[in-house]
Design a protein with these regions (language model features):
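Short hydrophobic beta-strand element within catalytic cores of glycosyltransferases
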Residues: 309, 314, 318-321, 331
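Acidic anion/phosphate-binding donor-loop and adjacent secondary structure
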Residues: 68, 145-148, 173-176, 182, ...
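N-terminal subdomain of nucleotide-sugar transferases
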Residues: 1-63
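A conserved mid-protein helix/loop that constitutes part of the nucleotide-sugar donor-binding site
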Residues: 23, 212-235, 248-252, 346, ...
Length: 395
């Protein structure tokens, strides 16, 4: 039987092999190749090829500004943080929308269905093109910009779609408040479980000596809540906090950490920067516990799902996380991890101390971690997406 032709669109994607940009769209595209002929359409970047085969996936990058060296709206990071970092980048937004629409219109007859990742800009642009599409809400595209013209555009996007998915139940609830599409499903992000594991352990990778390693991986931005994790180190001994990531709060958090280390008279916090997928595999495997202290940001943005927690699970790490956004879909308190309230500094420290100092609890969470990860393997997630797409196409 002839495979369907699937176009996957997004605005976060690796620019080249070994890039530190999130790769979940790439991994999904690779897994979907079992069911469809897959092409990915993403914004151009000065560091990326206009078209290439990346890890077996056909990738097209569209230009959106006459001066290509100024196409800096989407990378590194994401659109909203990039604008916050440099306000002038907001001038690139209309160019991006227009160019995305033009490319989607030009390609409208080449594909049977489009999978638009993020309502803004992909879903909204797609709603003005005739090709059938499903749209997936990932996080800030759902929880922020929900007034005025953006709410109307989001409603149009959800109404015109042949199907709507969200990566977590809390996000789906927000989408349903905007518009209830009869074809909707919660399908989380996935993880290549075969890629991660304790076999990638490297001894004394962080120069921690005999200290336990507490790991955070993610963008250094407000909603990640890293400042509360750093404060929690006041109440934790014989451990090193390793922070892997980059972002607008790096300088502020580094100063906070230096002050903390000075007060404790030890090197208990280490920043290692953004790392590649390959490097992260050993970083997870060489750590003892993973912490995700996310919060609701001032603009309403919150964690959509928390893919790094899934990678930590796949690496056999106990996870401690905030009850925030889509995290609660993945982490079940005292079953496969521990949950604390947002901004609860002593709560974070208490849970870390309990898990690290109680071998029975630690081993129980380690066993549950790997079991949880296997439920979210990309083969499982790709089948869910394919079944959903087949269902909505038939209707």
């Amino acid at each position: 039987m002839k495979k369907k032709r699937l176009l996957i669109t997004g605005s976060t994607f690796p620019r080249y092999e070994g890039d530190t940009e999130p790769r979940f769209i790439l991994d999904l595209a690779k897994a979907m190749k079992e069911y469809a002929t897959v092409t990915v359409l993403v914004p151009a970047s000065p560091e990326a090829a206009d078209r290439e085969i990346l890890e077996g996936v056909d990738v097209i990058r569209y230009h959106y500004f006459p001066i290509h060296s100024l196409e800096t709206l989407c990378y590194p990071g994401a659109i909203v943080p990039r604008i916050k970092e440099k306000k002038a980048r907001v001038l690139l937004v209309p160019w991006l929308f227009i160019s995305l629409y033009y490319n989607l219109f030009k390609m409208r007859k080449e594909y049977d269905i489009v999978h638009s990742n993020w309502l803004i800009p992909q879903g909204i642009a797609q709603s003005f093109v005739s090709t059938p599409y499903i749209v997936t809400g990932h996080g800030g595209d759902v929880t922020s910009l929900n007034n005025g013209i953006f709410r109307r555009l989001k409603r149009r996007c959800l109404k015109k779609a042949v199907g709507v998915t969200a990566v977590s139940e809390p996000l789906m609830s927000v989408l349903e408040d905007i518009y209830i599409n009869k074809n909707r499903a919660v399908i989380s992000m996935g993880c290549d479980t075969s890629f991660f594991g304790k076999e990638h352990y490297k001894e004394n990778l962080f120069g921690q000596g005999d200290k336990k390693v507490i790991l955070f991986v993610g963008r250094l931005a407000e909603k990640k809540g890293v400042t509360y994790l750093i404060e929690a180190m006041k109440y934790i001994n014989d451990a090193m906090l390793v922070i892997a990531g980059d972002g607008p709060l790096k300088e502020e958090l580094t100063q906070q950490a230096e002050k903390m280390c000075k007060e404790k008279q030890c090197e208990c916090i280490k920043f290692i920067g953004a790392k590649t997928h390959e490097q992260l595999r050993s970083i997870y495997a060489s750590s003892d516990i993973f912490v995700m202290p996310s919060i609701t940001a001032k603009d309403g943005d919150k964690e959509g799902f928390g893919l790094v927690m899934l990678e930590a699970f796949a690496s056999g790490l106990p996870v401690i996380a905030s009850r925030s956004g889509g995290i609660v879909d993945l982490v079940k308190d005292s079953i496969n991890g521990c949950l604390v309230e947002e901004k609860d500094i002593k709560g974070i420290a208490n849970k870390i101390n309990i898990v690290l100092n109680n071998e029975r609890i630690y081993n129980k969470l380690v066993m549950a971690a790997r079991s949880t990860a296997e439920q979210y393997d990309y083969k499982v997630i790709a089948k869910k997406y394919n079944d959903f797409i087949d269902k909505v196409i038939k209707e």
